[in-house]
From Swiss-Prot:
GO molecular function, one term: histone H2AQ104 methyltransferase activity
HAMAP family assigned to the protein according to its UniProt record, in alphabetical order: RNA_methyltransf_FlpA
UniProt gene name: flpA
Known partners and oligomeric status: Interacts with nop5. Component of box C/D small ribonucleoprotein (sRNP) particles that contain rpl7ae, FlpA and nop5, plus a guide RNA.
Name under which the protein is recorded: Fibrillarin-like rRNA/tRNA 2'-O-methyltransferase
A Gene Ontology BP annotation from the UniProt entry: tRNA processing
UniProt binding sites for S-adenosyl-L-methionine: T87, T88, E105, F106, D130, A131, D150, V151, A152, Q153
Function summary: Involved in pre-rRNA and tRNA processing. Utilizes the methyl donor S-adenosyl-L-methionine to catalyze the site-specific 2'-hydroxyl methylation of ribose moieties in rRNA and tRNA. Site specificity is provided by a guide RNA that base pairs with the substrate. Methylation occurs at a characteristic distance from the sequence involved in base pairing with the guide RNA.
Species name: Methanococcus vannielii (strain ATCC 35089 / DSM 1224 / JCM 13029 / OCM 148 / SB)
Catalytic EC class: transferase
One Pfam family of this chain: Fibrillarin
NCBIfam families registered for this protein in UniProt: PRK04266.1-2, PRK04266.1-3, PRK04266.1-5
Amino acid sequence: MEKIKVKEIFSNVYGVDLGDGLKRIATKSLAPGKRVYGEKLIYSENKEYRIWNPNKSKLGAAIINGLKKMPIKKGTKVLYLGASAGTTPSHVSDISEDTIVYAVEFAPRIMREFIDSCNERINLIPILGDANRPFEYSNIVGKVDVIFEDVAQPNQAEILVKNAKWFLNKDGYAMISIKARSIDVTKNPKEIFLEQKKILIEGGFDIVDEINIEPFEKDHIMFVGIWKGN
């Protein structure tokens, strides 16, 4: 076990000092002893923390890069779109603790990996579904406080608005990782980011934070918005 220093920087998100000057973040493990993606486990005051790798998590990258508004916190009910194999959802699960995190993934094979890696996390609800068609899982998902989206589709901003109309509480938050190259490989990414921001605003969001997540992900930006729509 390593002696470390931890400091809470957001609710249930910790800055980690290992004495080497490197910037690290971690979450306190909801399933001690269980790794999800080969992450490093470290210990302080008899608590286990999972180092959050920003190279494998866009939310982790945004936090490392100076995210100012972090709406996911203890007690937050979350709808996660694009769960993949569970890397970031597992950290969201740690943060929310005893509150439900609905995790939607489209690909059956990846969903099987997700279930295998996260089956000890009782607050994670895996849903095999298409984020483009929120009505298909509306019988499972209730109203939520936050929607997080990491779906590499040309209409990714529209997908967020669709799901917000179905599930997001008024004045709830959304976080979306926009991948410019999934929308148009011929355009300047900055132009694409402005277009996607406009779609989100016209769809009903007030954008309260935005942060580029390079060098961890090329041509990506994270938007945080408050839902003011219907």
